[in-house]
């Protein structure tokens, strides 16, 4: 498990200038990837609903409320936006934003699985972590589950059967019950699993357990086990399935805190419900107590067309090292800011002989969200 001293952590996160050291060591990073909703948007826009002040997202909004117990270790960005268009083209749909989170570039502007032709031949964060001997893990919901008579179950396969999940799948099953929303619907999307788009971290076009990179991927159920055993990686990427990450509404809608939601509101409620269970689980762990940092990250804004930048995207940091008490930072951030921050934190920056990954060279790190 990576540990960085307090003084070093402050220096690594600084954008420049003199700041006092943060208190305590930096521990594991947990990125929880959410989908397709603006944090704030103009009132006239109603195709999708925004997250801030949305009654379907009470847990998220409790994190943003000063004085609320859930907000104790929370800082968030009020000016986090999509990365700028590249060559005149906005960075949509989802997949190029996930690729950007690893490499600072976008790859192909589609949502196809990595093979046969969506591999991105660029250096990436997880590949550099791996080459430097540091640990990373991609936890993906609905993967590596056993089947009975062709039907998916909720039972996790033995670790010896785990794979690199290169292929998307979805459906319903009478022998499957989602642990968070209680439905029989499942949907794994490779486009939301950024590490599978780089050959250094996907092990090639091999969906069998023999793939040497299989050890870096795990079903989401394994997260609670690793937290309990204090064996989480230095860098942990967590992707809920397409219902729990706010991408899609369950076919029957979703009842949450006594209210039945349908459509876009249901997708928000499903994601909020997921976060309300997973975030406290991580916060209760030794890894979090030892300086762990949770980043609730949203892939892209919605509805901006060819002129992005009008709407903001959700970026929430939860850590004992955060400024806390729902501190909102107005510094302009994008996905490149996260990437630059992680390169500094894990000592993979030019100071240690590494090149900045893509657009992270032009970004501000997330310094304003942390104690100084």
Roles of regions detected by a PLM:
Residues 20-372:
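N-terminal pro-sequences and low-complexity stem/linker regions of secreted or lumenal proteins
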Residues 1-19:
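Gram-negative bacterial Sec-dependent N-terminal signal peptides
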């Amino acid at each position: 498990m990576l540990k960085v001293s307090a003084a070093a952590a402050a220096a690594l996160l600084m954008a420049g200038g003199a700041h006092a050291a943060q208190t305590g060591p930096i521990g594991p990073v947990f990125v929880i990837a959410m989908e397709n909703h603006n944090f704030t948007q103009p009132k006239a826009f109603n195709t999708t609903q925004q997250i801030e002040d949305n009654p379907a997202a009470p847990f998220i909004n409790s994190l943003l409320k000063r004085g609320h117990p859930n907000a104790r270790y929370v800082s968030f960005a009020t000016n986090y936006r999509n990365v700028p268009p590249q060559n005149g083209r906005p960075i949509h749909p989802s997949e190029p934003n996930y690729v950007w989170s690893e490499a600072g570039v976008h790859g192909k502007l589609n949502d196809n699985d990595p093979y046969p032709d969506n591999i991105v031949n660029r250096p990436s964060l997880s590949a550099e972590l791996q080459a430097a001997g540091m640990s990373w893990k991609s936890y993906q919901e609905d993967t590596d589950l056993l089947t009975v008579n062709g039907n998916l179950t909720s039972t996790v396969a033995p670790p010896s059967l785990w794979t690199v999940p290169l292929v998307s799948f979805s459906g319903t099953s009478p022998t499957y019950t989602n642990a968070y929303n209680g439905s029989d619907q499942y949907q794994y999307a490779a486009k939301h699993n950024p590490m599978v788009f780089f050959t250094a971290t996907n092990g090639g076009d091999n969906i069998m357990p023999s793939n040497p990179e299989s050890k870096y991927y795990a079903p989401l159920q394994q997260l609670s086990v690793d937290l309990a055993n204090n064996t989480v990686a230095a860098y942990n990427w967590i992707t809920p399935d397409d219902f729990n990450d706010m991408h899609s509404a369950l076919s029957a809608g979703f009842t949450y805190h006594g209210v039945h939601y349908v459509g876009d509101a249901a997708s928000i409620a499903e994601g909020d419900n997921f976060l309300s269970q997973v975030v406290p689980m991580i916060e209760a762990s030794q890894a979090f107590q030892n300086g762990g940092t949770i980043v609730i990250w949203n892939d892209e804004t919605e509805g901006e067309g060819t002129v992005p930048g009008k709407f903001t995207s959700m970026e929430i940091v939860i850590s004992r090292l955060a400024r806390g008490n729902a501190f909102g930072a107005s510094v302009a951030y994008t996905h490149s800011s996260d990437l630059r921050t992680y390169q500094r934190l894990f000592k993979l920056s030019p100071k240690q002989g590494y090149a900045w990954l893509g657009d992270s060279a032009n970004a501000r790190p997330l310094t304003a969200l942390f104690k100084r």
